[in-house]
């Protein structure tokens, strides 16, 4: 489709061609434009009281390949049109104001996650991790880097925490898991093909699944034994933003603290041994 056509102009052009249920989607987008750009297809369908297939057909009716492309177009229209966020910094902003703006983004991301993170889910996740033979910390793309960071933090307490480099190695590892193993998978969307392939394989092997995601109604969440929600919102135009990454690491730190405090004696011994081991690396 043409990239020069504004989403709202396109919607106006195709409005008469939409079905009754398609118009329900259009009406929701018009009245909740800013919120809608953050919703998964499942969440939007629920808000509109229609099936996910209806939302997908709506996207195709407007000329988009799928939901993700439509959501990006909506976000672009929100950013450049009358619905622009007045709190975004302008080109002439001072460096001091940018520092303040960035600080606000980080605080908002962490506070949003704190408010939406279930303490009960954290405890369930830690119970699974503590009882596991191996815990595989996995993700795709930037989320894999976060999984590596979380794995590294836990490695000072136990050698049962593992990572696997790419989607091929992850599915290989998943195929050899058993009921005593746990997967901690990080996926903001909870809806990537590689993630679903890995989780299906791990599930078939009997492994337990902990998913750290923003979307509790995502396909990945439906497969998980425990869902840890990252409450920070991310625009499709700002995918991979650092405040979102920090919010994910915040959840990782909460897991670590709970894990440590549930067995303080072992924690103290492990930290003493690992601290002594790495001391020789210092100059």
Map each language-model feature to its residues.
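Glycine-rich phosphate-binding loops that contact phosphosugars or nucleotide phosphates
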Residues: 130-250, 256-263
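CheY-like receiver
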Residues: 28, 125-128, 173
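A short, charged, Gly/Pro-tolerant segment at domain boundaries
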Residues: 262-283
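HTH-adjacent hinge/linker in prokaryotic transcriptional regulators
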Residues: 3-9, 17, 23-24, 31-38, ...
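Glycine-rich phosphate/diphosphate-binding loops that line cofactor/substrate pockets in enzymes
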Residues: 120-132
């Amino acid at each position: 489709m043409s990239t020069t056509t504004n989403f709202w102009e396109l919607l106006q052009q195709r409005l008469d061609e939409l079905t009754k249920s398609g118009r329900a989607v259009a009406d929701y987008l018009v009245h909740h434009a800013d919120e809608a750009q953050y919703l998964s297809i499942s969440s939007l369908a629920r808000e509109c009281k229609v099936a996910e297939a209806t939302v997908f057909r709506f996207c195709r009716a407007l000329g988009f390949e799928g939901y993700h492309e439509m959501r990006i177009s909506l976000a672009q229209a929100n950013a450049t049109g009358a619905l622009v966020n007045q709190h975004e910094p302008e080109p002439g902003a001072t460096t001091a104001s940018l520092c303040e703006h960035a600080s606000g983004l980080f605080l908002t991301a962490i506070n949003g996650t704190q408010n939406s993170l279930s303490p009960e889910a954290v405890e369930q996740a830690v119970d699974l991790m503590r009882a596991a033979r191996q815990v595989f910390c996995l993700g795709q793309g930037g989320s894999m880097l976060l999984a590596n960071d979380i794995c590294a933090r836990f490695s000072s307490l136990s050698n049962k925490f593992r990572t696997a480099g790419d989607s091929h190695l992850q599915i290989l590892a998943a195929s050899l898991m058993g009921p005593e193993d746990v997967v901690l998978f990080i996926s903001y969307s909870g809806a990537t093909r590689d993630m679903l392939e890995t989780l299906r394989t791990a599930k078939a092997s009997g492994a337990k699944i902990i998913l750290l995601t923003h979307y509790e109604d995502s396909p990945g969440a439906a497969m998980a034994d425990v869902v840890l929600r990252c409450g920070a919102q991310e625009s499709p135009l700002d995918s991979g933003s650092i405040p979102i990454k920090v919010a994910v690491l915040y959840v990782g730190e909460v897991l670590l603290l709970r894990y440590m405090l549930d067995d303080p004696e072992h924690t103290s011994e492990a930290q003493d041994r690992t601290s002594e081991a790495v001391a020789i690396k210092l100059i």
